[in-house]
Curated annotation (Swiss-Prot):
Catalytic residues, chain numbering: 22 (proton acceptor)
Residue sites binding tRNA per the record: 17, 68, 70, 116
Function, as annotated: Hydrolyzes ribosome-free peptidyl-tRNAs (with 1 or more amino acids incorporated), which drop off the ribosome during protein synthesis, or as a result of ribosome stalling.
Name of this protein: Peptidyl-tRNA hydrolase
Quaternary organization: Monomer.
EC number: 3.1.1.29
Subcellular location, principal: cytoplasm
Length: 196
């Protein structure tokens, strides 16, 4: 069983970004809150939108930073500091170029894969990379020069369905992570592949 006290969904703020691939982490947190009859409310001292859930018997805070993606660490560090939450008690959900739509993967620690949100969180947590990541696959445009436009673009309906299905399975696997631990959650989530 894993002790997670804070689940963060990365995003850019504002209506123009709400449906873009870069906001996949926030889609996951929003759905997680909704499934537990909660809604995120703005809390300025944490520079984001927050909610509180009881998940698998654990008291868990949800956070979607209201800052731009590359400043996500400000919100995460503020909440972690206030509630005395350690990096290894944090799960950060984010979009992942290196995973296809319809799939998601869990990992603990590691690099940031060039993801500016992860980079800033690691820096603001005292350069500590040892937090959990939920990597939600969005696919890759195939060319490095196209990445910015791709992550800030909206997926076509067929891809959106795949991403939504992977998020749905990720929510089920979050419960597995909390109840039965990382290995069981990884085994289940990594075997999942949504079909169109």
């Amino acid at each position: 069983m894993s002790s997670i006290k804070l689940i963060v969904g990365l995003a850019n703020p504002g209506a123009e970004y709400a449906q873009t691939r870069h906001n996949a982490g926030a889609w996951y947190v929003d759905l997680l809150a909704e499934r537990h009859n909660q809604s995120l409310k703005e809390e300025s001292k944490f520079f984001g939108y927050t909610a509180r859930l009881n998940l698998a018997g654990q008291d868990i805070r949800l956070l979607v930073p209201a800052t731009f993606m590359n400043l996500s660490g400000k919100a995460v560090a503020a909440m972690a500091s206030f509630y005395r939450i350690l990096p290894e008690e944090i799960l950060v959900a984010h979009d992942e170029l290196d995973i296809l739509p319809g799939m998601a993967k869990l990992k603990l620690g590691g690099g940031n894969g060039g993801h500016n949100g992860l980079k800033d969180i690691q820096n603001k947590l005292g350069n500590n990379p040892n937090f959990y990541r939920l990597r939600i696959g969005i696919g890759h445009p195939g060319d490095k020069s196209k990445v910015t436009g791709f992550v800030l673009g909206k997926p076509p309906a067929s891809e959106q369905t795949l991403i939504d299905n992977a998020i749905d399975e990720s929510i089920r696997c979050t419960e597995v992570l909390l109840n039965e631990g990382m290995t069981k959650a990884m085994n289940r989530l990594h075997a999942f592949k949504a079909s169109a």
